[in-house]
From Swiss-Prot:
Swiss-Prot/TrEMBL keywords: Cytoplasmic vesicle, Membrane, Phosphoprotein, Synapse, Transmembrane, Transmembrane helix, Transport
Example of a GO cellular component annotation carried by this entry: synaptic vesicle
Gene: Svop
Residue numbers on the Cytoplasmic membrane side: 1-87, 144-156, 202-209, 260-316, 395-401, 446-457, 511-548
Vesicular side: 109-122, 178-180, 231-238, 338-373, 423-424, 479-489
Name of protein: Synaptic vesicle 2-related protein
Phylogenetic classification of the source organism: Eukaryota, Metazoa, Chordata, Craniata, Vertebrata
GO MF, one example: transmembrane transporter activity
Length: 548
């Protein structure tokens, strides 16, 4: 009774009385307002009219009806065998994405020497991949919201696999430039695997599972470096490109096992398909389905850009765009800076080293040595502790504070590089900086799918991913071009950018820790319900949201 009383106090709607007797007078009926007496407590209620055909939200339904939403089913079924399979399959997509990114740092110097390419053509080979990713990220998000998460992910994977294999047979520079750009276009859809994955996860496991999926990114980068160590000296870069497509090939074969998101099916009106998917998951996990009838969410337009800029989401969208931009800008900038700093020994040696090589021919080149591959491997390994730290703090501090913490520590490490330090301390600072900037990236991947409703979740993640590619596209001009003029200005740019990103994280209006995924963008249906759990005092939480 205490729980019913709390809901009646919080929700401005009429609930049926269990006695079945009417407590309204004729004046009440005319005004649409009346009081209800429950065990001596009078509660003022207000009648709300529903549009014809509109689904009645569970919170407002007759308490004698047994109904449930997709969120209830996912929570009841829990984490089990199905989610483990999905974790591995989603991880393969992330592993393939990481390998395609890591191969850029291996392929560029190889083609520079083999085809005698000038420096600007080598740089363009990297930039064209990010241009493809930047231009397609929003498109893949729109496709996933309009036609389904599985559809968008499958098309992007087959696209990337096809052009990735063709890249290995490119006869001349112009061909590989076009083909790698098309590979980048396909990679722009890989982040949609996180959207699909998150929508099948119970609330308590969501953050940990998404972060653990990011481990596959680190595994992919390590695997690519190890593959290059054995393949490049004997078989060459063409075989490296072919073998690097292996995770995508495995994913393409197994992706037919993937179900469509039940949340998407409900939102698009496919109730029977959603129920079938939920029953399949319950069977695989050996868990019972909730009793009753699945409530269909109000059908609405999906994948519309304007929905990201409604008054409720406008500020969140703009701040997230800057956060994602800063993440990629700093992450890939650090990757480029690492090679420069290792070759120079420390920051103070860079300027003199640059002057010494200015007179060298632009076509001069050096093949990557085994020592170079080991340096790449060492810096890549720093992402594993980054995952562990983020995993430990994200459910303790919350998503916003975790992102802010990662940005602040990266900024401090960048500032400490101003000091003329030895190689060992330099390596330690670079290790810590990369661990935390990768941790900030991972926290953003947790937060973004949680903050947007199902109707715009894929588009929101896609546009954020697109802004990240803008940062990745710009950062070579800072980490390589500006570095030649002033190493201190370069470090100041990265440090300042991350400090601003930390502030942006703090100013995000919604904290998604302990919050259920939103099904609808309509606030009147309680879009910011904080799960169906309780707060620290054991009192059920209202639908006022988690805004701070």
């Amino acid at each position: 009774m205490e729980e019913d009383l709390f809901q009646l106090r919080q929700l401005p709607v009429v609930k049926f009385r269990r006695t079945g007797e009417s407590a309204r007078s004729e004046d009440d009926a005319a005004s649409g307002e009346h009081d209800v007496q429950i065990e001596g407590v009078r509660v003022g209620l207000e009648a709300v009219e529903l549009d014809d055909g509109a689904a009645v939200p569970k919170e407002f339904a007759n308490p004698t009806d047994d109904t449930f939403m997709v969120e209830d089913a996912v929570e009841a079924i829990g984490f089990g065998r199905f989610q483990w399979k999905l974790s591995v399959l989603t991880g393969l997509a992330w592993m393939a994405d990481a390998m395609e990114m890591m191969i850029l740092s291996i392929l560029a110097p190889q083609l520079h020497c083999e085809w005698r390419l000038p420096s600007w053509q080598v740089a363009l080979l990297t930039s064209v991949v990010f241009i493809g990713m930047m231009s397609s990220s929003t498109l893949w998000g729109n496709i996933s919201d309009q036609y389904g998460r599985k559809t968008g992910l499958k098309i992007s994977v087959f696209w990337t696999l096809y052009y990735g294999i063709l890249s290995a047979f490119a006869p001349v520079y112009s061909w590989i430039l076009v083909l790698r750009g098309l590979v980048g276009f396909g990679i722009g859809g890989v982040p949609q695997s996180v959207t699909l994955y998150a929508e099948f996860l119970p609330m308590k496991a969501r953050a940990k599972c998404i972060l653990l999926i990011e481990v596959f990114w680190a595994i992919g980068t390590v695997f690519e470096v190890l593959l290059a160590v054995f393949v490049m000296p004997s078989l060459g870069w063409r075989w490296l490109l072919l073998l690097s497509a292996a995770p995508l090939l495995v994913f393409a074969v197994l992706c037919f096992w993937l179900p469509e998101s039940a949340r998407y099916d409900v939102l698009s009106g496919n109730q029977e398909k959603a129920i079938a998917t939920l029953k399949r998951i319950a069977t695989e996990n050996g868990a019972p389905m909730p009793l009753g009838k699945l409530i269909i969410s109000r059908q609405e337009d999906r994948g519309k850009m304007r929905d990201l800029f409604t008054p409720h989401f406008r500020w969140t969208t703009l701040l997230l765009w800057f956060i994602w931009f800063s993440n990629a800008f700093s992450y890939y900038g650090l990757v480029l800076l690492t090679t420069e700093l290792f070759q120079a020994g420390d920051v103070c040696s860079i300027s003199s080293r640059k002057k010494a090589v200015e007179a060298k021919c632009s076509l001069a080149c050096e093949y990557l040595s085994k020592e170079d591959y080991m340096d790449l491997l060492w810096t890549t390994l720093s992402e594993f502790p980054g995952v562990l730290v983020t995993l430990w703090v994200i459910d303790r501090l919350g998503r916003k504070k975790t992102m802010a913490l990662c940005f602040v520590i990266f900024s401090l490490c960048s500032l400490l590089l101003f000091i003329c330090i030895g190689r060992n301390v330099l390596t330690l600072l670079l290790f810590i900086a990369r661990a935390f900037i990768s941790g900030g990236f991972q926290a953003a991947y947790v937060y973004t799918p949680e903050v947007y409703p199902t109707a715009t979740r894929a588009l929101g993640l896609g546009t954020c991913s697109g802004m990240a590619r803008v940062g990745a596209l710009i950062t070579p001009f800072i980490a390589q071009v500006m570095l030649e003029s002033s190493v201190y200005l370069t470090l100041a740019v990265y440090s300042g950018c991350c400090l601003l990103a930390a502030l942006a994280s703090c100013f995000l209006p919604i904290e998604t820790k302990g919050r259920a995924l939103q099904e609808s963008s309509h606030r009147e249906w309680g879009q910011e319900m904080v799960g169906r759990g309780t707060n620290s005092t054991g009192v059920p939480r209202s639908n006022s949201g988690s805004q701070e």
